[in-house]
Amino acid sequence: KQALEALTSEMIPVKYNPYPVKTHGIDNMPYVTCNDAFINLDEPDISLDLSQKIYSKAKFMGSHCQGQTEIKLDSIGPTIRAEHHGNIEYRRLSAEHGGKHTDELAKGLIERRLTVRECARIQTFPDDYEFIIPKSESQPSLSSSDAYKIIGNAVPCVLAYNIAKNIADKWNLYFK
């Protein structure tokens, strides 16, 4: 009863708080940037990872529409929306569409949206998690659209782990 009252109060006492202590930001570790999350990922055309090979081909609709922006590589990742209708953010945009990663474009890399794997990395999924599953007789398929929805609906894996760990550590306090 005491734990329930504490957990439903406007200011949850630290002793009962199920959320992990803040670890990143000012006076803490630096935030994980998109550059950090994308380290060692090949471009889709040379990747062997099916989740890195596939990305939304939705055309650029103008900056007035959702998902028509280029990610900032030196910043935290964008919100990965479950209902993006193909309008997942761009990994890189052409200069004509307002892109800033002109050095990458100059190297011949193409304007494209984030891959399924890049979205998964932003949400801290491990690389061995398979999102794209081709149809076979022994298992149902999972499309890229389904994969984007799964990733967008997910609580980031590292956050979920730390909340679960904190609850496990306080289990006896909650249920005594």
What is the role of each PLM region?
Residues 1-176:
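S-adenosyl-L-methionine-dependent DNA methyltransferase catalytic core
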